[in-house]
Amino acid sequence: MDFLKSLPPLQTTDSNSTTAAVNTTTTTATNTATTTATNTATTTTTTTTTNLNNLINESKKKIHRLTQEVVNKISAGEVIQRPSNALKELLENCLDAKSTTITVTVKDGGMKFLQIQDNGSGIRLEDMGIVCERFTTSKLTKFEDLRSIQSFGFRGEALSSISHVSHLKILTKTADSPCAYRACYLNGKLTPPSPNEQSSDPKPCAGVNGTQITVEDLFFNTPSRKNVLKNTVDEHSRIVLLMKKYAINNPTVSFILKKQGDPTPEVHTSGGQNSLEKDVIGSLYGTDLSKELKIITIDPNNPNPNNDDDDNISGSQIKNSNLNRLDFTMKGFFSSTNYNSKKINFILFINGRLVDSKNLKTGLEQVYSKYLPKGTHPFMFIRLLVPPKNIDVNIHPTKSEVKILHEEQIIEFIQQKVDQELSISSNSKTFSTQILLPGFDQDNVSSSQKKQKNSQSSSTQTKSTNNNNNPTSRKEPIEYAKDKIRSDSKSQTLDAFLNPMDYNNNNDSSIDDNDGSGIGRYDDVDGSAGAAGAGGKFNDNLIFNDNSENEAPRDIDNPLSSVTPIKSKEQRQQQSTTTTTTTTTTTATTKSNSPASKNDIKKLQEHTFITPRKTRKYKQVELTSIKTLISEFQSNVHDGLKEFFNDCVFVGCLDHSYALVQFGKKLYLINLENITKELFYQLSLLRFSDFDSIKFSQSLSIYSLLLVSLDSPLSGWMESDGPKDKIADYLTKLLISKKELLNEYFSIEINEDGELVGIPQVLDHYVPCTDNLPIFLLKLATEVEWEFEKECFAGIVKEISSFFKIEPSFLKLRDTQVNNQQQTNSTTTTNNINFIKKDGKEWIIQHLIFPAFRKLSPPKKFANDGSVIQITTLDNLYKVFERC
């Protein structure tokens, strides 16, 4: 009680009562402390006794083996973690079965219902009893097989795991089975389909080849897992993403995903042998992404591969020795620096398996971080092929992870290659253009445009009347520069009346520098025009040295004059006289072996002598088949585009593939190949049985030309088709048997000796590219349906239009060759060649092809297939240049 001594004394008058109070307080405190200590000691003793008893009880428990049912359920929980895991296992089984069509139907994110159907090899009846048992597979027999495993599955756990956490049904049929069989499974064993039935054996039923697996009530016997996966929307999104990934990696397989009861699929790819990964990516993720994809390939056997879409890979900076040591190949589709999204899309397949690689994903994200804005992400699809001996697939229960030999070095190579390509693409920018023509969205010109024209004409008349009556009338509104149209489709330029420079090497300078003219695509073996190219091969090096077009007429406006083209020195020395008629006549002569010639190959020279006609009136056709074909394209005319082609003004050519034209205040880009093909198709039908003729001064052997065409990769000839000489002989006889029809209706003249005498003149003053003559004859013999009248005429006209159309591919290559010559030879002569070629070509397009567009009946498809694309308007240009 020492602490009481420190307290101040109580101020009280009764000392006895104070002493009694102090004694009472002291006694109470002492009793309370004693009671608390006693209770604490009792609690501690009880806890110690309980823990000791628990330890004694635990030590008495024996180690025992888990039942097989418990083991299977635990294993199933590891393999099948959510519906998307189950679908992944089933998809890989379908692909292992060589399926070409896979259809998936889901309900509630796959928790309530998940069904997958394929057209693969199916399951044999004798295997259906054990198909859902654990560790049963047809893909692995011993552990060493893992080193060379090629299939997706190998453990035999997928169906077993699914059957332990759901109600599983299988309907399957093999190709040699007379019917399909249906069976139900639970916990890896066959089970009766309903409580009323006792037999669990597979039941025969109707079905198609392949397998249909239905999973119902997933995780019905594991409530904890089912409660975790309550978000069915998230589970469905995972399934959609999974289907997209497998669809991209297997473009030849058709993948279909839809919700139960919904007829419209959410994922649908067509598949087929011609389907490519880029096409699938475009259909699933949109064309905005597919246009910006870079195809990157790494192959130790081909360090400089050529990719599709001109995405060529420069492998000079890759160390081939290290690449060979790593022993892997890669093909990837990477978005360029012009594309980014808020969410990253990283898809990785290694030896066909969908796997994750955090290291590779992080490494590539670091590469893209230098080029993309902060907070945006790229699209990456990577397919790695590694020798099975260098990869361990037995790492993760869900097979989502693998281990690769030299993984760090492989990732480093991929990072380096992607960085190289992105640094190149970062220097360019892609701008989208509008394909649909504004104002031409409907078949007819908009009424507002017509009203505007009518109002303009009426206002003009009113103004003129008012001005005559009242000179002091109000002033006309000011016309701003940006609204003024300075071009007129009815006006003509001086160059239309001048003979243009010949673009076919028929001038002295081109003879000196470009090996002369002639059909450079084929070698003249025996020196005769009739056997031009006989037994020879396609000569791509001489592809540009051709007389591919008709020289433009010098006096095109004089209907009575015959026009002779410009000739080279050698041509003037060996000029031959040719009689011209009212038809267009092409004379073919061979060039002599002059010492001045720089090669020993004789080339076929073409000279065109033209007697222009006045406005043609087409001959009335009485054949029903031709009338039907004409009415088909006339009834499908886009009126807006019809006005467009009537009033557009030629601006210039772009790479000879496209031309720039102005219509009103807008600038358009038109596809010359598509439009000229349609033009010559329609002109061929309108000129049916009334063609002029282009004749050769020396007949050409059809057999020899067919042999040349069969040597071309364009022919598609394979060894299984038979010997080329026999094919050429058969096709020659076929064309000879049809010579009366071809001559009477299409002016394709063939004599009894199997020689080509002439071809039709579809458009006045225009001669097609003779490079295509062998292929034209081949297609004419093989692609035409000769048995039926309408199909026969349509097929012939189609091949004629393909023969006469503007071919941009050859012209691009020709300009490339000329540009290369300019780089090595900076003389004025070489520069003039390039000018001559482009100037002559543009003259042909501007003054022969473009006027014919007024006769065109443009189909409606031209409005949205890229044939006509709006580039800009005067208003937009005025904002930039402040003048027009």
Swiss-Prot record:
Residues 473-489 have a biased composition (Basic and acidic residues). GO terms for cellular component: MutLalpha complex. InterPro entries: DNA_mismatch_repair_CS, DNA_mismatch_S5_2-like, HATPase_C_sf, Mlh1_C, MutL/Mlh/PMS, MutL/Mlh/Pms-like, Ribosomal_Su5_D2-typ_SF, Ribsml_uS5_D2-typ_fold_subgr. GO terms for molecular function: ATP binding; ATP hydrolysis activity; ATP-dependent DNA damage sensor activity; mismatched DNA binding; MutSalpha complex binding. Its main location: nucleus. CDD domains: HATPase_MutL-MLH-PMS-like (cd16926). Residues 1-21, 297-318, 442-522, 544-605 are annotated as: Disordered. Residues 446-472, 577-590 have a biased composition (Low complexity). NCBIfam families: mutl. PANTHER family: DNA MISMATCH REPAIR PROTEIN MLH, PMS, MUTL, DNA MISMATCH REPAIR PROTEIN MLH1. This is DNA mismatch repair protein Mlh1. It comes from Dictyostelium discoideum.
